[in-house]
Swiss-Prot record:
GO process terms (BP): defense response to bacterium; intracellular iron ion homeostasis
Tissues in which the protein is found: Predominantly expressed in liver.
GO cellular component: extracellular region
Organism: Morone chrysops x Morone saxatilis (White bass x Striped bass)
Signal peptide segment: 1-24
Domain of life where this protein originates: Eukaryota
InterPro entries assigned: Hepcidin
Name of this chain's protein: Hepcidin
Amino acid sequence: MKTFSVAVAVAVVLAFICLQESSAVPVTEVQELEEPMSNEYQEMPVESWKMPYNNRHKRHSSPGGCRFCCNCCPNMSGCGVCCRF
């Protein structure tokens, strides 16, 4: 009889644990609001993406006299390394 009451007690405890886990409210995930992306291409002004170059500031150029710039060398379309200096 003692074994039967222990088995019933264990079954009740397990049932109670299962009920507690199934009734727990799940943590709601915070949904990050994302800005809708527009398909419009926004043109940047040339002054904002051309790299300024001053001959007195040698730290902006590499030892070979080349530098990275955009549309600053002849026959260059886009950005790249220019060694005309």
